[in-house]
Amino acid sequence: MNKHILEKDVQQFIKANREKSPTEIALKKSPFPNVSSAELASQIDGWQRSVKKLPTWAYSEGIYYPDKINLEQCSSEHTALIKQTLIAKGSRVIDLTGGFSVDSCYIAQEADEVIHCELNEKLSEIVAYNATILRVPNLICKATDGIELLKQSEDDAFDYIYVDPSRRVNQGKVFLLEDCEPNIVANQELFFSKSRYIISKLSPLLDISTALSSLKHVRYVYVISLDNDCKELLFIQERGFEGETKIHAIRLFADQIQTFEFTYDAERSAMSRFSEPQDYLYDADVAITKAGAFKSIGKAFGLSKIHQHSHLYTSENFFPEFPGRVFQIQQVLPYSALKKNNPFVQANIATRNFPDKVDLIRKKYKIKDGG
């Protein structure tokens, strides 16, 4: 961490040039003897990456930005807010995998103390400094291995363990928990000896059912999406819990949260109805489909599926609160009709469980994108 970057004239330069191309800044000579043009470009790039993802950081004076990869890997403030809601007031929390501390800072709004463990000493120093700027005095930064610190702690030293394991390099196409560091499957007994709750942030590539077979005492699974893009999975384990896991599919918006809850037992027992397309077509959000609520969502809204494997739904009724996209059906045509008389010069095209891909349809029938 180059503390000269925090000097007033350097900060003024960064603020005055933060809308410019970082590459342009990097290619020019630095006006400061102790701060390189590459460092200036890195800070400007960090601000630009944070404007939408981390507005609290971006619009706080004097924030020090880490390497690009740390910003790419960190949570957004949208998803960090979900973790905050999981924490009881007055708790003691340890974040085993630290990073840029977005989740830790939000968790610290509820907890009495959050121990932030980060092996990268430079990043740990940056986080500790930024915590003073953001006024998070209960974030305690330790430049150390979180697992080793946990082993040295007393039993029940914490109320929550938070962990965001990273996938080890050179693994196969199948995403397995055992391929991650730290290995939360192998360390479950250690974790439960130190804390009642374990909150694991996991990749949306992970198969939820496979993870549930590897993890013990899972009370909740959260599937979180933003703009119909699945961002992360949260597994909440509670020591001694033996009940049925509840699945929460969560859609995040700029100013609200939409949640759909179900269980896999209820999903297995639900029966789907089928019909031809009616007045409205319903396309469930990715949080719903990733969670696996294919029959539960149809049952909840009284919808019929148009095909067993397409996961598109239809109804005579309009439900504005449906978690996904809703289209009013104007006309239903057989695909073969396009060969005889194609009425579309320009259109948005989407397919489900269909042999021809979108690009092929556009090429075959000369349909431009948009509509």
Annotate each language-model stretch with its function.
Residues M1-G371:
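SAM-dependent transferase fold signal centered on methyltransferase-like domains
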